[in-house]
Amino acid sequence: MELPLHETVPSFVLRFTSDENDNKKILIPSVNTNRKRASALSLAQVRESAYGFGTALMSEDVVNRPWKKGEVMAFYSENQHDYLVAALGVMLAGGVPSLLSPMYKPEELNHAFELTRPRAILASVNTYEGAKNAATKFSQTGAGNVDVYVFDEEHERSMYTHLIDPGKKLRASGDMSLETVRINPTTDEAFYCFSSGTSGLPKAVRLSHSNMVTNTIQMTVTLGGRVNKPVYDP
């Protein structure tokens, strides 16, 4: 198989399939979620929301200034059905999601911040207070203000209220700022993932877009076997 080395994670994941598959609900909220307004998402909805998220990051209305390529958003949350939406949105804007364990203690969180220098944190309702305290502490080191957003539709710092919905409106009005972002899939980071820190503090692992696209194809083939229609067909 010839791997698509020209693909970024967003371009690969968000490619249009068919009307039937595009509108099928694929991301389902947990039955145990405490988010009252959480709803299942189709690929079309993931695409629209991710582009809204990324567009908002690059807008003049975002806190401080528009995001630049390579800037980092720390994800400090337990699993969420729309985790992928936010991660793709950050990548569309040229940013890098830094994926942190919601079990991190303050010293581990601060260490992760020192390694990746995040501009913003995306937390859950459960981790919000810890994220807010960590952001304040990190800002006091001279790192600048660290914005905090939340995976919740009703929270005062909701990523929907502050990023996705405003970004959708900008996109609908003709904002094409995301089309100016240039990413080299083989050299530019898609994610920072952290090791368990078994020996010492957690360590950041840099994964490129090509790394992630290749792994996605490998897992699709492994899990799908010869039963399902291939998701990727070069």
Predicted regions, residues:
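Conserved coil-to-alpha-helix start sites within the AMP-binding
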Residues: 77-88, 103-107, 234
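Short beta->alpha linker loops
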Residues: 45, 78-79, 104, 125-127, ...
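Structural core segment of the AMP-binding/adenylate-forming
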Residues: 92, 96-173, 179
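N-lobe entry segment of adenylate-forming
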Residues: 1-72, 88, 93, 114
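Conserved pre-ATP/AMP-binding loop-to-beta segment of ANL
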Residues: 24-26, 156, 168-194, 201, ...
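Conserved structural elements of the adenylate-forming
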Residues: 46-55, 205-234
